[in-house]
Amino acid sequence: MPVVRIEHAVPSFEKWKLAFDSDPADRKGSGVRRYQVLRVRDDPKYVMIDLEFDNIGEAEAFVQKMQGIWNGPAKAVMQNPRARIVDVVEGKEV
């Protein structure tokens, strides 16, 4: 299962969260099955988002869509966004 990990700094978490919740990328329509928003404990102005997809094609298309969004008005609520596509190798609840 491919996961897109996005990470970036935010000048204001609250303003960024409002933009994220407005869902300009249409997460469900883009194939996102599940996502998590993470914050760094010692740097609350840095966020990471993990988005799970069924296939690599959807993940790659989503990253392209996000690059377009990042080059638009999203610049006001985030700094230096970066996306990577990773594969889950192992996961287990203990």
Q: Which residues does each predicted region cover?
A:
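Short structural boundary motif marking the start of a folded domain
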Residues: 1-4
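Short hydrophobic/aromatic beta-strand micro-patches
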Residues: 7-9, 50-52
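Short, surface-exposed ligand-recognition loops at beta-strand->loop->(often short) alpha-helix junctions
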Residues: 9-19
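An amphipathic, aromatic/His-enriched active-site/gating alpha helix that lines ligand/cofactor pockets
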Residues: 17-36, 52-85
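A short beta-turn/loop motif at secondary-structure boundaries
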Residues: 38-43
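Surface-exposed aromatic
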Residues: 44-48
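Short, low-order "capping/linker" segments at domain edges
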Residues: 86-94
